[in-house]
Amino acid sequence: MRIKIFMAIAAAFMCCDLAFSQAKLVEKVEKKGDELIIPYSKYILPNGLTVVVHEDHSDPIVYVDMTYHVGSAREEIGKSGFAHFFEHMMFEGSDHVKKGEHFKVVTDAGGTLNGSTNTDRTNYFETVPSNQLEKMIWLEADRMGYLLDAVTQEKFENQRSTVKNERGQNYDNRPYGLVSEFTSKNLYPYGHPYSWLTIGYVEDLNRVNANDLKNFFLRWYGPNNATLTIAGDVKTADVVKLAEKYFNSILINSNITLTK
């Protein structure tokens, strides 16, 4: 059933793609001789998504990374921890991927996945056999373009509890766990976005509601504030076609005016 849904959505994305122009090559780095450099090609899609491809055919695997150029430094006083909290919500399912299905699709394909957040970026990544690349790109496109309607209060409360437990385990209840928090608080002036930890303060996590997180997504998430990086046993032309196929139908986020 899941494969049928995947194929149906793939067909819909492909039809939408026909109305859009192609990705533009903006940078190409090639290795010369014994030069210590990683060759890659960089493209920009019409909606602003950056796509970086590195070919490495040494093993039949591929690494897929979607980086959004937003982290805890874009939070406000009283709203700390939003970027990291939303990282958790991105694994809770989207319009076409039920809760738990994202993990299942990746692991059933023989892959691994995770995400991370720091002050200036949030990224989501998978490593899978290279013949599973299209599924991974589809998953990333679906949660970029079709996530918010799938955010429920139940999922929100579940992840609020998870994030609070994570803070307790890694900071509050660990010997010297608060050293980094006190260091940041004293290193930067009050109100500076680097003065609080990415995990956020417990009082802010208690205060946040689902609409706050949705507004954070609407403000900072979108193709024109993201970079898709693909590295492994792939052909650059094939990757670009897949990126166009699944991402071209996702509109530019007009709230984003950053220059990357």
Which role fits each region the language model picked out?
Residues M1-A23:
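Bacterial Sec-dependent N-terminal signal peptides
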Residues S21-F103, F125-V128, W138-A141, K214-K260:
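His/Glu-rich zincin catalytic helix
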Residues M7, E87, R143-Y146:
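Intrinsic structural disorder/low-complexity segments
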Residues A23-K28, S94-D95, E101-F216, T257-T259:
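Acidic/histidine-enriched segments that form metal/cofactor-coordinating
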